[in-house]
């Protein structure tokens, strides 16, 4: 995995930890272990790596050792789309756009686990099943 992909994956996963991100550890053969909730993240100085704790396995994993499960924009319900648009108000004066509360709208997408960074098409995340985040 390229360094920029690792960094993007780490940043994305950090933003979703408070909202119960589901991940699967990647086995050495490339297959995935069962999906579990991510517990927390941290930094371990001796290894100089950022890591995530998967409570069920009682182990620490780096971002490139985990595969998050995310929803696509197409998976969003009408209510979720309306809520997203409500949080991301746009004023257009003909030449410029002014976005209000963009951080709030990104937090909302993190909370409902929508892949707005293109991780699924780039093979960095798996598509979540409908039941996964209920």
Say what each PLM segment does.
Residues 1-134:
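Structural boundary micro-motifs
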């Amino acid at each position: 995995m390229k360094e920029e992909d690792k960094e993007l994956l780490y940043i994305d996963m950090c933003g979703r930890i408070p909202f119960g991100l589901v991940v699967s550890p990647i086995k050495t053969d490339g297959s995935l272990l069962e999906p579990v909730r991510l517990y927390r993240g941290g930094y371990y100085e001796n290894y100089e790596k950022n890591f995530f704790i998967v409570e069920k396995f009682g182990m620490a994993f780096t971002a490139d050792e985990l595969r998050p499960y995310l929803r696509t924009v197409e998976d969003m319900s009408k209510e979720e789309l309306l809520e997203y648009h409500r949080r991301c108000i746009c004023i257009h004066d003909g030449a410029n756009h002014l976005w209000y509360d963009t951080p709030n709208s990104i937090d909302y997408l993190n909370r409902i686990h929508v892949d707005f960074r293109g991780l699924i098409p780039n093979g960095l995340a798996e598509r979540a099943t409908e039941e996964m985040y209920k």
